[in-house]
Amino acid sequence: MTRSSPKSILRRVAAHEGAPKILQVLKEDGAVIIRGFLNQNLFQKLNKEMEDELAKRPLICEHNGEWVSGLAGSQTRRLNQLPAFSPTFRQEILNHPLFHEICEPLFGTHGCDYWMNTATVVQIGPGNAAQSLHRDQELYPVFNPIGKDAPEALVNFFCALSTFTDENGATRVIPGSHQWDDFTTDVTRCVPQTIPAEMEAGDCLLFSGKTVHGGGANRSKDNVRRGMALGVQATYLTAEENYQHIPREIVESMTPLAQKMIHWRSSYCPGGAGLWQINGTELANEIGLKANQPKKTI
């Protein structure tokens, strides 16, 4: 297998430098750290809203199998369905201006719309082994034979909600691996080529679905590492996480854009027909969905 030499650094771009610069580094390296993607008030509110729900989650993944446990982690708590219980997530994260300034050209270049694949809070505790290296785009095997020439169908905004260090399990990335020639071979032994994405709370590691990465081992004695993985994908793909069960009252408190992000509105690709419709028309109109409504309870 022919591989380009991995890049020796993981580049950083400040949020205020804007989407064009962030996208340029992402295109070249397959990964970029956005400094200050979430302001302090935002990530503190997220942490507060998620604390009780996260504490209820078990440490051990409910699925069996060595492959799954290697991805899920034995000392890891995972929290999904964030729009259901976090007002900050559904009102601020899903409407984050820079988030959409990045996604619109990234997916629009390939003539498609975008929405959420999944959103997960990942908390890694001391003693957790390193996650198996993988590419997120492997979720859709059709892309593997196409490799580096496949369209950008999935990206991940992995936001630090606490400090990420090499010792406490910072995500490890291989910059440049999105340009390797062969995506069908085993990458689990490429650990020596990885770089830890060390970040302060509020920073964000943005990486392509084609980029090899994996959570690092938490070698600390008492340091818990918490992050929020926000996967975004082309709307022509089935999402990993389903949000149809979220109470309608909650959904109707959201903006139309946020509703689309959780699959409660139809998607429209430039030059193509709509997706996720009812009777060939907008889903929200057919079901009488309102938006921006006051909500009586959280």
From Swiss-Prot:
Swiss-Prot/TrEMBL cofactor(s): Fe cation
Keyword Iron found: yes
Entry keywords, A to Z: Dioxygenase, Iron, Metal-binding, Oxidoreductase
Origin superkingdom: Eukaryota
Disruption phenotype annotation: Abolishes the production of aculenes A and C, and accumulates aculenes B and D, as well as a minor component, asperaculane B.
Residue positions binding Fe cation: H134, D136, H213
Pathway the protein contributes to: Secondary metabolite biosynthesis
Catalyses which reaction(s): aculene D + 2-oxoglutarate + O2 = aculene C + succinate + CO2 + H2O; aculene B + 2-oxoglutarate + O2 = aculene A + succinate + CO2 + H2O
Enzyme Commission numbers on file: 1.14.11.-
Keyword Signal among record annotations: no
Any GO BP: biosynthetic process
GO MF entry, a single one: dioxygenase activity
Entry's family note: Belongs to the PhyH family.
Role of this protein: Dioxygenase; part of the gene cluster that mediates the biosynthesis of aculenes, a unique type of norsesquiterpenes that contain a nordaucane skeleton linked to an L-proline moiety and are of mixed biosynthetic origin. The pathway begins with the synthesis of dauca-4,7-diene by the terpene cyclase aneC using farnesyl pyrophosphate (FPP) as substrate.
PANTHER family: MULTIFUNCTIONAL DIOXYGENASE AUSE, PHYTANOYL-COA DIOXYGENASE DOMAIN CONTAINING 1
Self-association state and partner proteins as the record states: Homodimer.
Record protein name field: Dioxygenase aneA
Source species taxonomy: Eukaryota, Fungi, Dikarya, Ascomycota, Pezizomycotina
